[in-house]
């Protein structure tokens, strides 16, 4: 999901900067973090400071796009490979080298790449109480071998702190006016005639082929598409029914009533619900594609960074119940540790399926795992063949 969550967020980075400039402290211990804007509530930063037994200095800076954070990891790696060619723009305020960054937000989509390119190093967090409570689905995702492939006994390469999914958004007001029932599952895009030419799909083969696989009772991570009966026929039919494909311009048509439904990413839909509360969303009953934001540690080779106890303290702090609830309620993306009931949520979001997602649906959903090159070629060939049927 390369393009997901690339829309600029609100004022999160400014709020973090203001908070830290006011209370960064002068303690000897320092934690330097580069994170995705609005993925951590600013309230947690001051709470973490209060939680420490001694004064600490927090250096948090937010970026608006995950791709920018991946590039930061690449820049750190280049700097470490050629320290004599270090340039001033790779320095942090105060003259510290960028290799002193302790943690960076990384989307799980890029975890394999980051491991293969040696941009990050394993995290020694297996003994943390939070790790012991982290659901197996997330533990499995971040255990990888040195090539970035899933490995049951692999090292831990990331610490998940929030997640989201591909969902179906719809205009509840328009549905009520038309007397339509809300969508419930992917199959509605095929079988409900009133939806024909009324919905948009993400312009990504992994997403569209994946939801079709789910409709057929398969996994998003199916490796041999040729062995899935009726897959091509189902995709061709879906292609006839969709109004348009877009990964970055699907919300405006929904707001303007040019479409009645849109397949999109939960964080983006949560954001527009603040201004357009009639836009609702449903997590498809047969399961969906999942993503997660991770804390990763740059592969700096810096002994001071590796031994920084604040790294583990911060990760474990993010996994605490109160922190998990704050992340879930204030960022629009549930924490993997948020095992609270609906009654624990504010009334306004108790019934918001973007946050209060049922465990049954979650168990049916899939993180997008790395695929072999042969499978990637199958996806691309099938995608191109199906899209040619649009004319």
Q: What are the residue ranges of the model-derived segments?
A:
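N-terminal secretory signal peptides and thylakoid transit peptides that target proteins
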Residues: 1-18
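Beta->alpha turn/N-cap motifs
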Residues: 36, 86, 105-110, 204, ...
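A ligand-binding cleft/hinge motif common to bilobed small-molecule-binding domains
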Residues: 111-113, 261-278
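A bilobed periplasmic-binding-protein/Venus flytrap-type ligand-binding module shared by bacterial periplasmic
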Residues: 169-174, 214, 292-307, 326-330
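Early extracytoplasmic/lumenal segment of secretory-pathway proteins
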Residues: 24-113, 117
């Amino acid at each position: 999901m390369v393009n997901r969550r690339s829309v600029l967020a609100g004022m999160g980075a400014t709020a973090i900067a203001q908070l830290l400039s006011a209370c960064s402290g002068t303690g000897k211990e320092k934690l330097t973090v580069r994170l995705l804007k609005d993925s951590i509530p600013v309230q947690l930063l001051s709470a973490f400071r209060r939680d420490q037994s001694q004064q600490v200095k927090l250096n948090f800076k937010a970026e608006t796009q995950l791709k920018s954070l991946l590039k930061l990891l690449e820049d750190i790696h280049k700097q470490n490979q050629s320290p004599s060619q270090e340039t001033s723009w790779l320095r942090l305020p105060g003259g510290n080298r960028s290799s002193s960054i302790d943690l960076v937000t990384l989307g799980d989509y890029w975890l394999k790449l980051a491991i293969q390119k040696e941009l990050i190093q394993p995290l020694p967090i297996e003994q943390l109480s939070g790790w012991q409570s982290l659901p197996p689905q997330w533990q499995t995702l971040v255990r990888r071998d040195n090539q970035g492939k899933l490995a049951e006994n692999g090292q831990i390469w990331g610490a998940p702190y929030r997640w989201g999914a591909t969902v179906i958004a719809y205009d509840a007001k328009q549905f009520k006016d038309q007397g339509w029932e809300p969508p419930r599952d992917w199959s509605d895009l095929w079988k409900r005639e009133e939806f024909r030419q009324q919905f948009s799909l993400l312009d990504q083969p992994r997403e569209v082929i994946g939801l079709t696989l789910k409709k057929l009772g398969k996994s998003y991570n199916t490796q041999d598409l040729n062995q899935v009966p009726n897959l091509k026929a189902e995709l061709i039919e879906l292609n006839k029914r969709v109004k348009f494909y877009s990964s970055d311009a699907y919300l405006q048509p929904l707001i303007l009533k040019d479409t009645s439904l849109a397949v999109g990413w939960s964080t983006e839909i949560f954001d527009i619900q603040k201004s357009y509360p009639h836009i609702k969303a449903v997590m498809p009953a047969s399961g969906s594609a999942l993503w997660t934001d991770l804390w990763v540690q740059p592969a700096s080779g810096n002994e001071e960074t590796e031994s920084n106890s604040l790294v583990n303290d911060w990760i474990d702090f993010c996994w605490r119940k109160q922190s998990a609830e704050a992340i879930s309620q204030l960022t629009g993306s549930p924490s993997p540790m948020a095992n609270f009931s609906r009654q624990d949520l504010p009334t306004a979001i108790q019934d918001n399926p973007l946050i209060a997602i049922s465990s049954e649906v979650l168990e049916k959903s899939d993180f997008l795992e790395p695929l072999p090159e042969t499978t990637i070629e199958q996806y691309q060939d099938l995608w191109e063949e199906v899209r040619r049927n649009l004319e």
